[in-house]
Amino acid sequence: MARIAGVDIPRDKRVVISLTYVFGIGRTTAEKILAEAGISEETRVRDLTEDELGRIRDIIDRIKVEGDLRREVSLNIKRLMEIGSYRGLRHRRGLPVRGQNSKNNARTRKGPRRTVANKKK
């Protein structure tokens, strides 16, 4: 397995797919990286030379990926919470942030149901 940005990428897959194993690189970014490096998307990782891997690494070093990107996202969320914005409050309460309905659904964000016991009459 080749290591790129601290991630072992699979050898048997096409390069364009393997690059998506790095956090922060999707299909579009992977295609742009390969175009800039002058490498075919159809090439398998096992067929890449060290020179080609080096070119890919150099391009990825200029992009914010993995730990740096995760840190930036968490700092952005923390900033929203500290300034007391609506989005920050939604993050703090563990509710959907982008205006989705939360009366009936939103179970992914809210977690499992917490049932409330009935009052005796």
Swiss-Prot record:
Transmembrane as UniProt keyword: no
Domain of life (superkingdom): Bacteria
Gene Ontology annotations of biological process type: translation
Pfam families: Ribosomal_S13
One GO molecular-function entry: tRNA binding
Entries under InterPro entries matching the protein: Rbsml_uS13_C (IPR027437), Ribosomal_uS13 (IPR001892), Ribosomal_uS13-like_H2TH (IPR010979), Ribosomal_uS13_bac-type (IPR019980), Ribosomal_uS13_CS (IPR018269)
Keyword Nucleotide-binding: no
Keywords for this protein: Ribonucleoprotein, Ribosomal protein, RNA-binding, rRNA-binding, tRNA-binding
Basic residues bias locations: 106-121
Region annotation Disordered: where it falls in the sequence: 91-121
GO annotations of cellular component type: cytosol; small ribosomal subunit
Similarity field: Belongs to the universal ribosomal protein uS13 family.
Quaternary context: Part of the 30S ribosomal subunit. Forms a loose heterodimer with protein S19. Forms two bridges to the 50S subunit in the 70S ribosome.
NCBIfam families on file: uS13_bact (TIGR03631)
HAMAP family: Ribosomal_uS13
Alphabetical list of PANTHER family matching this protein: 30S RIBOSOMAL PROTEIN S13/40S RIBOSOMAL PROTEIN S18 (PTHR10871), SMALL RIBOSOMAL SUBUNIT PROTEIN US13M (PTHR10871:SF1)
Function: Located at the top of the head of the 30S subunit, it contacts several helices of the 16S rRNA. In the 70S ribosome it contacts the 23S rRNA (bridge B1a) and protein L5 of the 50S subunit (bridge B1b), connecting the 2 subunits; these bridges are implicated in subunit movement. Contacts the tRNAs in the A and P-sites.
Protein name: Small ribosomal subunit protein uS13
The species this protein was found in: Bacillus cereus (strain ATCC 14579 / DSM 31 / CCUG 7414 / JCM 2152 / NBRC 15305 / NCIMB 9373 / NCTC 2599 / NRRL B-3711)
Gene encoding the protein: rpsM
